[in-house]
C-alpha cells in the first residue's frame, strides 16, 4: 500500500524544517485548516522521537502565528491527531491538524475535541 504523504510530489509546502512540513488540508474543516506532517514515515505521533516532537511544537507555533496574521477573525484553534483506525485515522502516516476557529463558526463549540464522542461533548450537562 502506498502512503499519500510519502508518495505525493504535488504538495504545496507552506513551511518546513528538518523533520516535517506544513500544508493546507485539501478537505478543510474550516478555512486555512493546516496539516503538519513528518518527513519520516511513522504511523502515529507516539512513534516520533524527541527531536521530531520538538520540531512539531516549533512548526505548530510558527503556523499559528502565520494563520493569525492571515486572518484577524481567528479566535481559537483545535489541534489534534487521530492515532489508529478506531480513533478515526484514515491515512496511516502521522499528521497533526491545526484547525483555526472563528466566533460563530458552529452553533455550540462547547466541549471542543470531546465532540469525537457526540454524547460526551457537553460534559457539564450530563
Roles of regions detected by a PLM:
Residues 1-126:
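HIT superfamily nucleotide-processing domains
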